[in-house]
């Protein structure tokens, strides 16, 4: 603002100085009195052909030259020149503007980095991406899925067979082994110790066992009778 004011004042002073010089060069015209001058004594103007006509000067050349010795002209030139102090101040004022822009950009970048860090901390950790070598192919995936389905079907079939066997065991009654005990209506005694004969390698028949038992019973009766007599 100071530099602009100085230029404005210098331009005003230069214009005033030029107007002052132009006014000095213009001479005032003589004013003749009406009483002394009569129409008879009026001088006649010379003809136009006799008087040489001067060419009209352009408007740019009409400006009066400035004398270098005049102190006013020096003041005007000094006013037009820019002050070094003002120029330095203007340069200094421009420099911090660039620095302030850089500082603003750096602050924005720092804010973005801090926001990204906070967002990354809030998000749950994701597993690292597998490399191309570690990634299984589509065919391998299909084979693995088929094997899994087959295993599931096998387990289901096993469970079904086990359930069927359990249901059969529950419905069919257990077949007990034939007991060797004598029933109430049978006259034949129990077969306690079957002996295999070396000749036939077969079990003795029921009739043979009955004869043996009768003999033993007769012996027992005889012994009981002898004991009673005694």
UniProtKB/Swiss-Prot annotation:
Regions that span the bilayer: 7-23
Domain of life from the UniProt record: Eukaryota
Membrane topology: Single-pass membrane protein
Feature: compositional bias, Basic and acidic residues: 60-83, 113-173, 211-230
Basic residues biased stretches: 101-112
Region named Disordered: 27-230
Low complexity bias: start-end ranges: 50-59
UniProt keywords, alphabetically: Membrane, Transmembrane, Transmembrane helix
Subcellular location per the Swiss-Prot or TrEMBL entry: Membrane
Gene Ontology CC terms, in alphabetical order: membrane
Keyword Membrane: yes
Protein name per Swiss-Prot or TrEMBL: Uncharacterized protein AH6.3
């Amino acid at each position: 603002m100071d530099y602009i004011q100085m230029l404005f004042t210098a331009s005003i002073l230069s214009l005033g100085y030029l107007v002052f010089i132009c006014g000095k060069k213009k001479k005032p015209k003589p004013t003749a009195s009406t009483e002394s001058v009569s129409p008879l004594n009026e001088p006649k103007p010379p003809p136009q052909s006799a008087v040489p006509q001067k060419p009209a000067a352009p408007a740019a050349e009409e400006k009066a030259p400035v004398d270098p010795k005049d102190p006013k002209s020096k003041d005007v030139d000094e006013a037009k020149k820019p002050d070094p102090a003002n120029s330095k101040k203007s340069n200094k004022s421009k420099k911090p503007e660039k620095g302030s822009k850089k500082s603003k950009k750096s602050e924005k970048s720092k804010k973005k980095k801090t926001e990204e860090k906070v967002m990354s901390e809030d998000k749950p950790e994701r597993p690292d991406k597998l490399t191309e070598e570690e990634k299984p192919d589509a065919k391998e995936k299909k084979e693995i899925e088929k094997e899994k389905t087959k295993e599931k079907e096998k387990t289901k079939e096993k469970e079904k067979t086990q359930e069927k066997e359990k249901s059969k065991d529950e419905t069919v009654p257990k077949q007990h082994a034939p007991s060797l005990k004598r029933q109430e209506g049978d006259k034949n005694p129990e077969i306690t110790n079957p002996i295999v004969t070396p000749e036939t390698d077969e079990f003795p028949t029921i009739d043979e066992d009955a004869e043996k038992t009768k003999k033993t019973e007769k012996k027992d009766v005889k012994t009981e009778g002898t004991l009673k007599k005694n």
